[in-house]
């Protein structure tokens, strides 16, 4: 086992030997040919979208991990895509909403278990406004949505640790502004 929740490689992709092991220095190395493979974090985006009551838009996950639990809208950044483009694409795909403004807030590391493998992600969090909330429609990876006051949401209903951490951050920053 390694940091990914499974044995990632059985054989070295360069020489084919069975000596391809995960090192304590966070990469895979073949003890036969010396090939090194670095498996870095994947980037993901998260949107904080509020309604006129300042409630935060939470989605309901339609797939595992954490199927049926609360999440914040967003998703993985595709290869060759900017975080900003991924943010706009994911919000359109999941909720049929068009972003008209966004502001970077913070990052949050995450472990995303899927298919027997643990993906390490870095979630880039943005405060967003949309052109028209009336166009909202759950789609793609989202089975539903709810607007909830960030101070009233039960963090036990949130499926991913990084999202719970983001909610805690929002609570703390809003409390300090009062």
Feature roles, as predicted:
Residues 106-134:
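Active-site-adjacent beta-strand/loop module that shapes the phosphate/pyrophosphate-binding cleft
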Residues 32-56, 76:
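Conserved N-terminal beta-strand and adjoining loop/helix that marks the start
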Residues 12-15, 30-33:
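Short cysteine-rich clusters marking metal-coordination/redox-active sites
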Residues 137-167:
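NUDIX/MutT-family hydrolases
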Residues 20-21, 38:
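Short functional micro-motifs and their immediate structural scaffolds
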Residues 5-9, 26, 43:
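Short metal-coordination and nucleic-acid-contact micro-motifs, chiefly zinc-binding Cys/His arrays
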